[in-house]
Amino acid sequence: MIRVWYALKEGWQQRKALKRYLSEPVLRVNALSELTPERLDKDNIAVLVLDFDGVLAWHDAKTPLPEVERWLTGLCQTIGEQRLALFTNKPKPERMAYFQKRFPSIYLVHGVRKKPYPDGISQVAEYKGIPVHRVALLDDRLLTGMLSVCLAYSQGYYFTKPYHNYLRHPVKESFFSCLRMMERFLIKVLG
């Protein structure tokens, strides 16, 4: 409950910055294929931090979707695993084991408060020895991921077409879809 209150309070203070993710196309990503090595270099990104739920797979999936794994493999082959990190609010053991086995050099954020707290982004910058403004988070939520970007003074990409599986998890996926719609509505109206 404290995290929800924190998100609402900080979201109110950062509402104009959050509105940029809705109004500026350059800050949005509609498909993972839009995040290319060239775009990351153009945006001066040293490390791309990935959320899991909604970005790499639907909620509660144990591994990324096959097309996501192909994209991730291609990105790792071009920019290297050391330029990627994973920061999920649900670091389930199966997910961590998958990344440790399949992509062992991708940094796994651990031991920090969940988003929207900026601790995970700061941890990546500190671990990699780079300024925090050279870290970018790819996330599908405004009041968690994008808010943590604003609070950390880093960069972010708002993932506008998150993965979902309504057949497998109808209640959970509907809940998160409603949350995303409410976030967008509040930021559009109040920002």
Positions of the model-derived regions?
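Asp-based phosphoryl-transfer active-site loop
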Residues: 43-60
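Asp-based, Mg2+/Mn2+-dependent phosphohydrolase catalytic module
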Residues: 1-43, 62, 68-69, 73-137, ...
